[in-house]
């Protein structure tokens, strides 16, 4: 007998997951997608299996805006293990070198200013970046090491929260593309003892914080009690990650033409940049960009939610 294909639901919005330890970002996404029985899903940038914390998951129409969350700033807390370096720059790798730890709080505090502001990082081999279509981590597992171009990132804040024995707990606010494993490893080299990431927790992604997240266990319990539709209550609006963008409200006439791909004028539009747009009934209908002539050109449109 042929297997009956599961009919997925057309649901839209963002669920802020507190990603559990040991899950890849995609595994967490697929689990929540199953709980929702959602037709379309995507996440907004990977967290290592070792990492926990804020992982925005986009469903339906919200996937059209995931790139803007991917580009947003992030915040982390990490526990650095001093005195050792590993193949992966975290606790999941093999130890490459062990050195004595002779530094204390004052030494760590003195080293941190070197890593604030705009800095250069060489991405780790164990990363999802690709070389000739092949993820670097696959090359690394095969024993290959390839040259990686340094990348410029911004560390807006780097603070020492605690220092105990041969560990240091750090808090970091950083730009997209920052590798906390590389940051910790570089700090360890600056201290002369080496270091790797023992724990990593993302505390903020763009406008989203840990206080807004839901755990996988909570979602599973709600699903067990009420099925797919019960999980819908955790869905945030598709534009939740864009609330700091200028908001324009179009008339019914302007909304019609704009939704058909026509640039329109808006008297209260900013002089430049991206905007989010609502129709005359207050429904989010997409994002646009202010053109040179002052009209709002549609960039990403959505169906009514």
Curated annotation (Swiss-Prot):
Reaction(s) this enzyme catalyzes, per UniProt? uridine(55) in tRNA = pseudouridine(55) in tRNA
InterPro entries recorded for this chain?
PsdUridine_synth_cat_dom_sf (IPR020103), PsdUridine_synth_N (IPR002501), PUA-like_sf (IPR015947), PUA_sf (IPR036974), tRNA_psdUridine_synth_TruB (IPR014780), tRNA_sdUridine_synth_fam1_C (IPR015240), TruB_C (IPR032819)
Under Enzyme Commission nomenclature, its number is 5.4.99.25
Keyword list (alphabetical) reads: Isomerase, tRNA processing
Q: Name one GO molecular function term.
A: tRNA pseudouridine(55) synthase activity
* Cystine connections: none
Please give a single GO biological process term from the UniProt record. Answer: tRNA pseudouridine synthesis
The source's domain of life comes to: Bacteria
- Where are the active-site residues found? 48 (nucleophile)
Task performed by this protein: Responsible for synthesis of pseudouridine from uracil-55 in the psi GC loop of transfer RNAs.
PANTHER family associated with the record: PSEUDOURIDYLATE SYNTHASE TRUB1, TRNA-PSEUDOURIDINE SYNTHASE
Q: What family is it from? A: Belongs to the pseudouridine synthase TruB family. Type 1 subfamily.
Q: Mind telling me what this protein is named?
A: tRNA pseudouridine synthase B
Report the source organism.
Pseudomonas syringae pv. syringae (strain B728a)
